[in-house]
Amino acid sequence: MDYKSAGVDVEAGRAFVQRIKASVEATHRPEVIGGLGGFGGLMSLPAGMRKPLLVSGTDGVGTKLELAQEHGSHHGVGIDLVAMCVNDVITSGAAPLFFLDYMATGALAPSAMAEVVEGIADGCRQSGCALLGGETAEMPGFYPQGRYDIAGFCVAVVEEDELIDGQRIQPGDSVIGVASSGVHSNGFSLVRKVLEKANADANTVYGDNQRPLIGDLLAPTTLYADLVQHLMQSGCELHGMAHITGGGLPENLPRCLPEGCSARIDASSWTRPTLFRWLQEAGNIPERDLWHTFNLGIGFCLVVPARSEDAVIEHCRGKNHQAWLIGNVTSNTPGNAAVLEGVPA
């Protein structure tokens, strides 16, 4: 008996590393020291920083992986993984530095795994961060054959005096919503139940334009790092930011609001994508659950002074991100939790 007969193919692992090497190295920034194969990834801080703060985040893709693996779509979930981590850390105004990934599978499928890593590398390039290292664990008997799970870890950096922590937010500020690409990577346990109820498959289409349902559900999560860095470098005054993930607007926008502030949202200020209407109708999902599960077309929020709202929206559109003024900050009794008016509580 040997390791391969026990379910772990070391040679396939080596071939996999060689296949992904070029994609990984293409993400490297000038600060990266060394290459693949070491026990740890090495990277220096960007030159010229005065008082840098490191910002870290970790996340996964959830049960979107189940749907992606059923339909042989692997590259997109790699982008999703980067987006779920990077979109969190950039809310502080930090620029992504490096990313690490962890993949676990029952049996290494080099082609599928390579597609995932190539997607991760794609997301890293779009976000300006280096894919500094990773781990692929082959765990026969623990994961089902042909199934894998992935997790990501991101570190970003911001000057201490440029940190955006929401403390400058005040009543009267404007809330700008930046468009999502669709469901992103949250709510897929509910999505999969709706698909099951509707007997949907790879050939199912929806909406007036008869769009491919599965294709739209698996659209990669939008990356906002380049947009945020552009806004900061353009001198836009950003008081706060929120990544709209699980819990939707009602549970994520309040996370960036300081004590004494709430927000009023105008749900008619943007057009809810047809995909969410299909999910609601096919699954008979109550309106409140829809708001507290999905992003409903808003993947990221920017809180800015009212005088800056038009300029910020124009900057967003100039970077190919659709954006709308969706609400404003209101006052709240100190000590009370921030709430959103205009959406189901």
Swiss-Prot record:
Organism: Synechococcus sp. (strain CC9605)
Keywords: ATP-binding, Cytoplasm, Ligase, Nucleotide-binding, Purine biosynthesis
An individual GO BP term: adenine biosynthetic process
Family of this protein: Belongs to the AIR synthase family.
EC number: 6.3.3.1
InterPro entries registered for this protein in UniProt: PurM-like_C_dom (IPR010918), PurM-like_C_sf (IPR036676), PurM-like_N (IPR016188), PurM-like_N_sf (IPR036921), PurM_cligase (IPR004733)
Gene that this polypeptide is encoded by: purM
Protein name: Phosphoribosylformylglycinamidine cyclo-ligase
Pfam families, alphabetized: AIRS (PF00586), AIRS_C (PF02769)
Pathway assigned in UniProt: Purine metabolism; IMP biosynthesis via de novo pathway; 5-amino-1-(5-phospho-D-ribosyl)imidazole from N(2)-formyl-N(1)-(5-phospho-D-ribosyl)glycinamide: step 2/2
Matching PANTHER family: TRIFUNCTIONAL PURINE BIOSYNTHETIC PROTEIN ADENOSINE-3, TRIFUNCTIONAL PURINE BIOSYNTHETIC PROTEIN ADENOSINE-3-RELATED
Subcellular location: Cytoplasm
Cleavable signal peptide: none
Enzyme's top EC category: ligase
Catalysed transformations (reactions): 2-formamido-N(1)-(5-O-phospho-beta-D-ribosyl)acetamidine + ATP = 5-amino-1-(5-phospho-beta-D-ribosyl)imidazole + ADP + phosphate + H(+)
GO molecular function, one term: phosphoribosylamine-glycine ligase activity
GO CC annotation, single: cytosol
Disulphide-bridged cysteine pairs: none
